[in-house]
Design a protein with these regions (language model features):
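Collagenous Gly-X-Y triple-helix signature in extracellular proteins
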Residues: 1-278
């Protein structure tokens, strides 16, 4: 029996179909959790979803060899609106066609531009191209508040609009960066345990990077969109031990739980997404 998303509780799980060509990377379906409903600052009458698990190991942004800032030259750019990851998440382009430069020194996440040559994704199709198009058609454009670092980007904050996006420290219940609230707390994130995320089997098996602690049974790092105020090249992420934030250089690998999206609350789960009853 079909249900509306709005009738389900925060924490309920939804399966979204992956197109057959991409199932080796993500499995046949990606599982999302309801993170909130009618969340402040998000589209009205919407339901917010986030992936249940860490679905890929990817860099936030690639090294920028022509950037005049030495940190960004070596490690990548932490300005969220310019990140490779955000662009890929919101693209429905075919394989190898999702990337375009967002500023004069921008660079794609090629093998040469990612940490230790692990897990480049410049040749992939855009993320939206990998999902059921009927589901993608229902995604709502959402405005996000993003802090800016004080070193290169002027401090304060800016807004970014997209359909898929990364959460902020504020939204997962961690400290505001430089006293800037990047949105408001999502209802799903009530304590440390609620921030724990585990890699999927496909995330582990598809990764060129290996580690004895990188497994489906152990929690791992996942990206946030928040840049530390005093750095040009690192980004906050939820870490494994204390489930608080740490920082990682943008070309380094962290795990992409990443996906937050909004759908109207009347969206029927039977249309393309299916509720998981557990």
């Amino acid at each position: 029996m079909s249900k509306t998303l709005g009738s389900l509780s925060v924490g309920a799980k939804i399966e979204v179909p992956v197109l057959s060509a991409y199932q080796s990377r993500f499995g046949s379906k990606i599982v999302f959790k309801i993170a909130d409903k009618n969340h402040s600052g998000y589209p009205s009458n919407s339901v917010t979803l986030i992936t249940e698990k860490i679905i890929q190991l990817m860099c936030f942004d690639a090294k920028e060899a022509s950037n005049s800032n030495s940190d960004r030259k070596q490690y990548g750019n932490n300005r969220y609106q310019y990140s490779n990851l955000l662009q890929w998440l919101n693209s429905n382009a075919a394989a190898g066609a999702w990337y375009s430069a967002k500023h004069s020194a921008d660079a794609p996440p090629t093998n040469a531009n990612v940490w230790n040559n692990y897990n480049e994704y410049d040749a992939w199709a855009g993320f939206l191209a990998m999902l059921d198009p009927k589901f993608v058609a229902e995604l709502l454009t959402t405005t996000q508040t993003v802090a800016r670092n004080t070193v290169t980007d002027g401090g304060s904050y800016e807004t970014v609009t997209s359909k898929m996006f990364l959460p902020s420290t504020t939204e997962v219940g961690l400290a505001n960066e430089n006293n800037i609230a990047e949105g408001t707390l999502l209802a799903l994130f009530s304590n440390d345990a609620s921030r724990v995320a585990y890699p999927t089997a496909q995330c582990v098996s598809n990764s060129e990077y290996t580690n004895s602690n990188f497994s489906t049974s152990k929690g791992w790092y996942w990206w946030l969109r928040t840049p530390p105020s005093s750095y040009a090249n690192v980004v906050r992420n939820v870490r494994t031990a204390l489930w608080s934030t740490t920082t990682r250089t943008t070309a380094t690998l962290a795990f992409a739980r990443f996906v937050i999206l909004n759908l109207l609350s009347w969206y029927l789960t039977a249309r393309t997404a299916t509720e998981i009853i557990r």
